Amino acid sequence: MFQGASALTLDAKGRMSVPARYREALQGQAEGRVTVTKHPDGCLLLFPRPEWEVFRAKIAALPMDAHWWRRIFLGNAMDVDLDSAGRILVSPELRMAAGLEKEVMLLGMGSHFELWDSQTYNAKEQAAMAQGMPDALKNFTF
């Protein structure tokens, strides 16, 4: 289970150091293998490989009218491995798609992660908070 936010930096080659608190879980759950793909909100999704296989099966089963979504998720997916220093390489294509340059935010989302450009994430978070609680959360107790 992945949760929490980590402010990270991409190096000049596009490598990101995975926080130590997630490395052991990724090694145990997925032998350090992850899959990275686009998300329609403008970030990237990072899945441990077993979780990716579950997600991939759901996407592949979508009806024909969702063929563009299959292209977005599956056609842009890249398999990567944690290196000996606990880093993953984010491809230039995926960095460009998500507007990632240097400062990024890694969010644990339960079974997977989202990777955002820090400025984009902060702006979207502020906009969401300014809109107030959605109806789905009106009766939710904190």
From Swiss-Prot:
Any one GO biological process: negative regulation of DNA-templated transcription initiation
Cellular localisation: Cytoplasm, Nucleoid
CDD domains according to UniProt: MraZ_C (cd16321), MraZ_N (cd16320)
Cellular-component GO terms for this entry: cytoplasm; nucleoid
Protein's UniProt keywords contain Nucleus: no
Pfam families noted in UniProt: MraZ
Keywords: Cytoplasm, DNA-binding, Repeat, Transcription, Transcription regulation
InterPro entries linked to this entry: MraZ, MraZ_C, MraZ_dom, MraZ_N, MraZ_sf, SpoVT-AbrB_dom, SpoVT-AbrB_sf
TM stretches of this protein: none
GO MF, one example: transcription cis-regulatory region binding
Chain ranges of the SpoVT-AbrB domain: 5-51, 77-120
Gene3D superfamilies xref list: Transcriptional regulator MraZ domain
Family that this chain belongs to: Belongs to the MraZ family.
Oligomeric form and interacting partners: Forms oligomers.
NCBIfam families (UniProt xref): division/cell wall cluster transcriptional repressor MraZ
Protein name in the entry: Transcriptional regulator MraZ
Organism annotation: Burkholderia cenocepacia (strain ATCC BAA-245 / DSM 16553 / LMG 16656 / NCTC 13227 / J2315 / CF5610)
